[in-house]
């Protein structure tokens, strides 16, 4: 397995796929990572996507799983002909399937582009604007918090301590009259 090639059991020579070989910046195969005492790094931009399970985090479990039975139902005693029911089921299912494919074919790439730009802008603003503003605010507020702490310990603590001592001598007695 030298030079990014391997031999199968029948003696055929193959090159490893690019994803297993890594790139020029970080090796992504186990042999090179072990040789360099590094952990194997996977790039999020070149990872393979799962074409079978397209919702691995179950984002749409409660929302988009709409089947024929979820939309159209005939109660007991009010049934159409069996052929009509089967044709309606087939029409609904096939129409939903192909119309979704048509819409995703037309609008899928542009919407992916729009959402990619949107989340890139959000990430950029969070990294380069929001977090630095919050950090600078926390640094600047430390000065005010120290002055406020001195003010509270100097003026408010003695005042409220004195008020507490005044009210601590109040005794209440209750009597029940019949």
From Swiss-Prot:
Q: Where are the transmembrane segments?
A: none
Record's keyword annotation contains S-adenosyl-L-methionine: no
Q: Which InterPro entries match?
A: Caveolin, Caveolin_CS
The UniProt entry's GO CC annotations, sorted and at most eight, read: caveola; endoplasmic reticulum; endosome; focal adhesion; Golgi membrane; membrane raft; perinuclear region of cytoplasm; protein-containing complex
User: Where does it mainly reside?
Assistant: Golgi
Stretches assigned to the Cytoplasmic side:
2-104, 126-178
Tell me which residues bear the S-palmitoyl cysteine lipid modification: 133, 143, 156
Which of the residues bear the PTM N-acetylserine? 2
What this protein is reported to do is described as: May act as a scaffolding protein within caveolar membranes. Forms a stable heterooligomeric complex with CAV2 that targets to lipid rafts and drives caveolae formation. Mediates the recruitment of CAVIN proteins (CAVIN1/2/3/4) to the caveolae. Interacts directly with G-protein alpha subunits and can functionally regulate their activity. Involved in the costimulatory signal essential for T-cell receptor (TCR)-mediated T-cell activation. Its binding to DPP4 induces T-cell proliferation and NF-kappa-B activation in a T-cell receptor/CD3-dependent manner.
Subunit-level organization: Homooligomer. Interacts with GLIPR2. Interacts with NOSTRIN. Interacts with SNAP25 and STX1A. Interacts (via the N-terminus) with DPP4; the interaction is direct. Interacts with CTNNB1, CDH1 and JUP. Interacts with PACSIN2; this interaction induces membrane tubulation. Interacts with SLC7A9. Interacts with BMX and BTK. Interacts with TGFBR1. Interacts with CAVIN3 (via leucine-zipper domain) in a cholesterol-sensitive manner. Interacts with CAVIN1. Interacts with EHD2 in a cholesterol-dependent manner.
Q: What is this protein called?
A: Caveolin-1
Q: Which organism is it from?
A: Echinops telfairi
Q: Which residues carry this modification: Phosphoserine?
A: 2, 9
**Annotated region described as Interacts with SPRY1, SPRY2, SPRY3 and SPRY4, given as residue ranges:** 131-142, 167-178
- What is the protein's membrane topology class? Peripheral membrane protein
For the modification Phosphotyrosine, which residues carry it? 6, 14, 25
Instruction: Supply the source organism's classification.
Output: Eukaryota, Metazoa, Chordata, Craniata, Vertebrata
For the region Interacts with SPRY1, SPRY2, and SPRY4, give the residue spans. Answer: 149-160
- Could you mention a single GO BP entry for this protein? caveola assembly
Which region ranges are annotated with the description Required for homooligomerization? Answer: 2-94
So what family is this one in? Answer: Belongs to the caveolin family.
Which positions are listed as intramembrane?
105-125
Q: Which UniProt keywords apply?
A: Acetylation, Cell membrane, Golgi apparatus, Isopeptide bond, Lipoprotein, Membrane, Palmitate, Phosphoprotein, Ubl conjugation
Q: Where is the segment annotated Interaction with CAVIN3?
A: 82-94
- Modification N6-acetyllysine, positions: 5
UniProt KW Oxidoreductase keyword: no
């Amino acid at each position: 397995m030298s030079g990014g090639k391997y031999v199968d059991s029948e003696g055929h020579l193959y090159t490893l796929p690019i994803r297993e070989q890594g790139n020029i910046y970080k090796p992504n195969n186990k042999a090179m990572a072990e040789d360099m005492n590094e952990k194997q790094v996977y790039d999020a931009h070149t990872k393979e996507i799962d074409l079978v399970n397209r919702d691995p985090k179950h984002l749409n479990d409660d929302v988009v799983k709409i089947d024929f039975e979820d939309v159209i139902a005939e109660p007991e005693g009010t049934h159409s002909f069996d052929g009509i029911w089967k044709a309606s089921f087939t029409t609904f299912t096939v129409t939903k399937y192909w119309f979704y494919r048509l819409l995703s074919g037309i609008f899928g790439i542009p919407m992916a582009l729009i959402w990619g730009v949107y989340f890139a802008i959000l990430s950029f603003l969070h990294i380069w604007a929001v977090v630095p503003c919050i950090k600078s605010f926390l640094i600047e507020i430390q000065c005010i918090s120290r002055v406020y702490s001195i003010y509270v310990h100097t003026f408010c603590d003695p005042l409220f301590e004195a008020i507490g001592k005044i009210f601590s001598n109040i005794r209440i007695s209750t009597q029940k009259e019949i």
